[in-house]
């Protein structure tokens, strides 16, 4: 990096079949539910998602003999809605509300999963990606270990944003087991509360808002509770977007 003088490495999770890091989360959740017996052959997987986890779950459901129901805010991008419809998900679009609202997409998914479990022959599960520790576990066992191996242990820091907190929790645990001195950084968008939580322990949303979808939360998920974060950065859209387009124009990388 000419700007920083550092070597900056990116992990190309967009090369996963569903196009994002959430394919790992989806696989981890399904495998854990299979192992526990909660997910029966031919069963239904229900999840509330901003899109990417729903895409991963639907692809895996198709390949593994399950069906998927995806609950998503209708404010999410048309591209994600179109993709889920193309993949054959049972897509339920709901209004965008705060997490405290009983009609929030996550709570709607939970209620739907209970209904399906009662009436469908092969049952149903709620994936509950925010608080299901199978999320962070697969990132600890795969994503974090891959970063350590692929850098040959020559990594000083890792930084990512948090939606469910599964990636940053799992990767931070894995890397710090190898080297406790590795710095873990959180990039938090405007309007989210984790930046202030890391700095002061207060769960206070920052000023402003962001166009980023599925990133930035105002409560501590069970996954994020395990994240070993050393430093947090508040990133505005005005700061992030020029870098996104610079990477596209000069590096040939479309990152969002």
Residue ranges and their predicted role:
Residues 1-256:
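PLP-dependent amino-acid enzyme catalytic core
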């Amino acid at each position: 990096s000419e700007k920083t003088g550092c070597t900056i490495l990116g992990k190309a999770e967009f090369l996963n079949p569903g196009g994002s890091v959430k394919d790992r989360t989806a696989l981890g959740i399904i495998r854990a539910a299979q192992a526990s017996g909660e997910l029966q052959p031919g069963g239904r997987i229900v999840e509330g998602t901003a899109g990417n986890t729903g895409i991963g779950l639907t692809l895996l459901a198709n390949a593994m003999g399950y069906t998927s129901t995806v609950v998503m805010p209708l404010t999410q991008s048309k591209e994600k809605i179109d993709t889920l419809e193309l993949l054959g998900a049972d897509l339920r679009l709901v209004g965008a509300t705060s997490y405290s609202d009983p009609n929030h997409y996550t709570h709607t998914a939970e209620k739907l999963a209970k209904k399906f479990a009662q009436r469908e022959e092969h049952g149903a599960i709620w994936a509950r990606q925010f608080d299901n520790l199978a999320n962070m576990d697969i990132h600890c066992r795969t994503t974090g270990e891959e970063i350590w191996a692929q850098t040959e242990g020559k990594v000083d820091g890792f930084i990512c944003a948090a939606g469910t907190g599964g990636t940053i929790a799992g990767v931070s645990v894995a890397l710090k087991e190898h080297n406790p001195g590795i710095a873990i950084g959180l990039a938090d968008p405007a309007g989210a509360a984790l930046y202030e939580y890391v700095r002061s322990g207060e769960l206070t949303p920052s000023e402003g808002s962001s166009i980023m979808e599925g990133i930035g939360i105002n409560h501590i998920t069970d996954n994020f509770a395990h994240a070993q974060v050393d430093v947090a950065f508040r990133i505005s859209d005005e700061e992030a977007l020029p870098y996104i387009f610079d990477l596209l124009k000069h590096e040939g990388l479309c990152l969002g």
